[in-house]
Amino acid sequence: MLKVGRDNVDFLDHYDVIVVGGGHAGCEAALAAARLGCNTLMLTLNLDKIAWQPCNPAVGGPAKSQLVHEIDALGGEMGKVTDRTYLQKRVLNRSRGPAVWALRAQTDKREYARVMRSVVENQPNLSIREGTVTDLVLGRNDEVVGVVTHFGSVFGCGAVILTTGTFLGGRIWIGRHWQPAGRAGEFAVEGLTDTLRQLGFETGRLKTGTPARVDRRSVDFSVMERQPGDPDLRWFSFDPEVWVPREQMDCYLTRTTPETHRIIRENLHETPVYGGWVEAKGPRYCPSIEDKIVRFADKESHQIFIEPEGRDLPELYIQGFSTGMPEKIQIQMLRSLPGLERCVMLRPAYAVEYDYLPATQLYPTLMTKKVQGLFCAGQINGTTGYEEAAAQGLIAGINAARLVQGKPLVTLPRESSYIGTLIDDLCTKELREPYRMLTSRSEYRLILRADNADQRLTPLGREWGLIDDRRWALFQAKQARIAAEIERLETQRVKAHDPAGIHLSQLTGQGIKGSATLAELLRRNPIHYADLLELGLGNEELDPFEQEAAEIAVKYSGYIQRQQAQIEQVSKQYHRPLPPDLDYHSIPTLSKESREKLAAVRPLTVGQAARIGGVNPADINALLIYLEVRQRQKTAAAAPVGA
């Protein structure tokens, strides 16, 4: 680690913001900083692998799709690129309520990377350069002032964003064999973890993995279940300019067999985890196939999805089949699956372990607490998934830009968005396994829907400087149309004896007393907006997404209002700031565990304190009472004598 004044270093060049890494977090961070007017440099190991999808070439899914919609609503890029490069789209959980609807897209991995790289390369204020960052340069006040590459080049800056993915101390494993790598064919980064430890950061190890790729020409799809895309297309981006319908490709479903399970059980000792060579925790919600066989021993079979990696590629991704087995055993496992009996493996599956920084060492702005100007985003913070990484990268990029411009840093409260929930969880909870976003992690799912992400966040994106005039005009016009339609639905009435009234009564099995508004009828099951259109009572000038937004707002208005009231009630207490100099060890009414946890995390608000593992409601009440007593004592001490 270099610790010097700015004037004592021979900088090769100087930038406002330097982003270390060119993955999904790095791209969003670099684009955000550059679009906010900062001279930005992205330093990445391999220019040909910008925005690469090293595991599943897919975007979205439960909770993850909400993240992508929110990224787009704030002015990010992931949703646009996905809409331009998808191979297939499906809405998951469609039979359930709108709070958990999830758009998922299979993407063309090479096209996705090519399009995102083009966006990055053509972004004003943004330079990209190939290089491996191995050290940081600190100023006299321990603020970050630059980075050092493997070959000794030094670049100065006002802020650094680390988006290192799985490359920090990365090792990939196939059976008993390993090599230093962040992913297959790419070098690991050594040295940077040592610097972070010297600065006093706690580090740990996590594990993930990716399945084998097989040649589609060697697969028999006729014995598998076809999984086509949805005929009615949906979009991640709220910008109609990127809505281009494309021919969709099929995915397929097969299943593990008793033979698959036998091969795995007999060879568990050959895997890095069960063999005892890797102790790092893997993702709970995306386990290896051997973990599934061990943890769910009573299950006779597991679903395996066969997914294309590209429109012009022979490679198929074997989803749900990641493993660390030796290659010879991997082939046996693959050929035990129906339809893959003669498959040719093009790339073996592997496990990868890497260094990370527990994110309790960050503020919710994603700047580290120990080093001014140093931000972290993506897998370095303990998350798993492209969408989680991109969301963090966007917020880190916004705040790095604001820091160098002398503006106050911004945060998203957990009740505002899935992004806010994600970051709050990371900065508050002690996570010892890769974190994946789930709808169950949000207390406010009905309000944090995919369809209203623009309504919730685009005004913030505009305020922060990432939503241009064209997007803002589109947003305002759309919201005006939806508001007008909701008002029409709440006021237009249908009489009981009208043909439409009779039809709707028969549909619901409930009569109409005199007359009813369209909104009242929409709240009855199973009436939907499509029924109103069929009867000539809908607004055909609205696009289907605007019609749906109006329907959801009306149909769930009571639930939404109750949840909004709950948020407002909780916010009054939970948004109360905690003094930065608060000595938790001196509060005797707190439990010992709570004192230790609060002192370690140093939460910014009462709400953040309440979400720390090991801090119970009684401790929060004790903390609130202590703050009240302290405030009264301060007020009394400040009062004039004799007053």
Curated annotation (Swiss-Prot):
PROSITE patterns listed in its UniProt record: GIDA_1, GIDA_2
Gene Ontology molecular function: any one: flavin adenine dinucleotide binding
GO biological process annotation, one example: tRNA wobble uridine modification
Record's GO cellular component terms: cytoplasm
Gene symbol of the encoding locus: mnmG
The protein's name in its UniProt record: tRNA uridine 5-carboxymethylaminomethyl modification enzyme MnmG
Family: Belongs to the MnmG family.
Location in the cell: Cytoplasm
Residue sites binding FAD per the record: 21-26
